[in-house]
């Protein structure tokens, strides 16, 4: 049966579960489930092989930027040019975000492994991963823009406008939509995840 004719969100005939004695057995069984699944799993494959890798790279890079920003905040040029009242909060924010963003990297590795096995545990971890990364990305982007406004608003030679605030709002809305769509997509494919 072609995938174009498969309209149900669960298997008409569940693939026969083989004897599973190792992780390689679970991976082979997961691949068979994906092959036989009645709904399209194109986004699933993209999410597993592309999104998780990009998320790890971007989060690792952002964590490094946060650490660099902490040290840069103590430089004389920043101390003299930025609004002094906002600097302590900016430093604290970057320290916290560097930890939260760095934590995403091992989570991406675990997520990739979980999506290779498609167990019930994998589905629970997937929901946690989506919520955690969406929240961290939204806070990281929006707070960075807002701190930029707080640090350099009214400072000569720094172009701060309403665009920064609008971009902060947009990033939160975008990540909320991203989260909802992904949760819905994987919920419709809940039957993929089984022990």
Q: Could you say what each language-model-derived stretch is?
A:
Residues 40-43, 109-122, 176-195:
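Cytosolic juxtamembrane helix at the C-terminal end of the final transmembrane segment
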Residues 48-70, 102-104, 134-145, 174:
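Canonical alpha-helical transmembrane segments of integral membrane proteins
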Residues 64-78, 118:
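Membrane-helix exit/juxtamembrane interface segments
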Residues 72-92, 140-167:
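Interfacial non-cytosolic loop connecting adjacent transmembrane helices
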Residues 90-111, 170-175:
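Generic alpha-helical transmembrane segments
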Residues 106-141:
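Loop-to-transmembrane helix junctions at the membrane interface
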């Amino acid at each position: 049966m072609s995938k174009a004719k498969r309209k149900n969100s669960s298997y008409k005939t569940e693939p026969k579960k083989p004897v599973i004695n190792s992780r390689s057995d679970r991976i082979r069984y997961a691949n068979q489930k994906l092959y036989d699944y009645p709904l399209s799993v194109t986004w699933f494959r993209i999410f597993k092989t592309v999104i998780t890798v990009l998320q790890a790279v971007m989060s690792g890079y952002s964590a490094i930027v946060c650490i660099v920003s902490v040290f840069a905040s103590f430089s004389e040029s920043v101390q003299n040019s930025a609004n002094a009242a906002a600097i302590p909060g900016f430093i604290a924010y970057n320290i916290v975000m560097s930890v939260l963003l760095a934590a995403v990297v091992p989570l991406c590795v675990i997520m990739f492994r979980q999506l290779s096995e498609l167990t019930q545990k994998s589905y629970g971890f997937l929901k946690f991963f989506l919520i955690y990364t969406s929240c961290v990305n939204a806070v990281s982007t929006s707070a960075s823009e807002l701190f930029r406004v707080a640090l350099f608003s009214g400072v000569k030679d720094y172009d701060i406008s309403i665009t920064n605030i609008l971009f902060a709002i947009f990033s939160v809305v975008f990540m909320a939509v991203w989260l909802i769509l992904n949760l819905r997509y994987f919920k419709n494919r809940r039957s993929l995840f089984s022990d």
